[in-house]
Every structure is written in C-alpha cells, then in structure tokens.
Amino acid sequence: MQRNEMDDAGRCGMALTRRRTLGAAGATALATLAGCLTDDGSDTREYSLSIDRIERSPVEHALYEPDDSPLFGDPAETALSNVLPDGRHTTYGYKPVPNDGYVEYEGSYFQLIYVVTGRQQMERQLVRVETVPEEQVPEDAILVDSLERPSARIIKILHSDSQSGGGSSTAELLRDDGYVLRRPSERESRLARGELDGRVVTMTDSGAWAYRVDVTTETITETAHTVMATEVATSQSEFREVVFGSRIDAELTPAELPADAREILDEAIAGGTYTEEAPKTAAFETLLAALGLGAVDTAANGKLLWYDDELYRYGLYSNTTEDGS
C-alpha cells in the first residue's frame, strides 16, 4: 500500500516531492499522477533496499568449508591440514583459503590469517589468447565446454577479458594479459601439458568468439602468502559471539523499530526489494540508519542482518533516472 496517497489527480497543485514504487498498485498510482510531474528533464535519484533470507544460522554461515573440486577444494584441504591447529602453509601467487575465514577443528574455532613472507622468482606457465576471425576458424577447433574444468575456466577468463577490453572483473586474475598457471590442477591441465598450445578454441558451436591459444614458460616474481590459524573460541556459544561481533552488520528486533520503519523492512523482506525516490521518507531514513546505511550515497552490498531470529543479506543501491523517460 502507499501511505499519504493523494485522493485524486486534482490535488496536483500540491508539490509532489516523493513517490514510492511498490509493485503493480504503486505503478498504477504513479500512472494516474503522471500528469502532475513536471517534464523539465530533471533527474530523479532512486534508492533500492534489497534483502534476502539466508537459510542458515549465523554460525553455519560464517564457517568456511572447502568445496569438493580438485581445482579449489584440494588446495584448500591441503592448506587446512597443514595449518590446523598451529601450523603454517605457504603458497606463491595465490591464496588457497579465504583471508579471515573461520574454520572449526576438534570443537574449537579458528580464524585464518595471511601474512606476506617474501617473494620468490620461479618459472611459471602463462596462457594468452589471440582472437581468430570466424571465417578463419579451422574444422578441428575445440569447443571450450569440451575441455576439463581448469582449462575451460582459464579460456573463459581470457575471453571475458578480451571482450571487455581488460575491464572485466576477471582482469585482476591476469598478469600482462596472461593467466598464470599456479594451482595444482592448473599445472596438471591440458594447457600445462601443451596439448592446447597453438590450437583454436571456440566459445560456441557456431565458431563465434574463437581464440588461438599461446602457452609460454616465463620466470616471474611471485609473492609468498603464508596462512596461519588463530584460535578465537573453544565452544559454539563463544564462537557465536565472535560471529556477531565481526560479521553481523545490524542486529534488530521488531520492537526496536518504529512502526512505519518496521513496515518498510517487512515489506522488503516479503518482496526482496523496497524502492523510494528522493527525497527519502522519514521512515525509510530511520530504517537505513538502523541498518548502518544512513551515510551510503551510491551503493553498499553484502551486509548481514539478524532480525527477528532470522539471518538476512542486504544492500542499498541508488541510481539516477531522467524524469519523463
């Protein structure tokens, strides 16, 4: 429902300073009032609060567990077996487990902490690709999805970088436009064995987005990342307090919020998103302040909320739209 909804379009003489987008009912109301809005080409800032329920407890959500893949899981398992409870594990150029991650070991809880312990020159294989025009794709070109996971993942990363001109989120995984084979599965892949060197790999069956693969061996300087574990709790109840102190961004009960702010939060939980246009209502401002988002101007995401004995992930996003567009 819309609060403070105007009775009819005849009241457009009053300054209409805010609108709330609340599904179909809200859209209909906005359409009715559209004639009231000045078509001066001015921009309108829109704020969207997104929130999703996490179907795990805060303790379960905080604990890191390696997956079962050889590519990521095996190096992580090796690191944990060397680190827990009081060891060290060093890798060069990559981190096999998350920094600051929490793990459980024999009833106690530990936090993983990395330190840089030096650099070392070593020989590494680097994979680069060169675009091949579709009309020059050979009949024996290899479809990327037919490759084993380590090789396919690397080609897809290089494809993404090529298509974005180096502006994709995967660019940080590359070194001078090349992917360095570091993880054990990568160093045992078809790319590492030279089976794909000089071959053309396509991203689709039609031959679109084709690349010639180039694998070289170079001497590069790798950073030494050493991970250790620090015990933070000796029981689950103690660890829960650690999690709430370090991972939970907002802890609220329904009684702590004014009724109008609580209504907005419940609406966002039910629908996944709640949106307002600037200027924000007082109730929305109150809720954002309670969530620690009062000073956010553009975006904040990945936040965690404990509300009414449930765990949620939330974020705030804003964008500017042109009125009348």
What are these regions (language model features)?
Residues 1-325:
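Terminal disorder- and signal-encoded targeting elements
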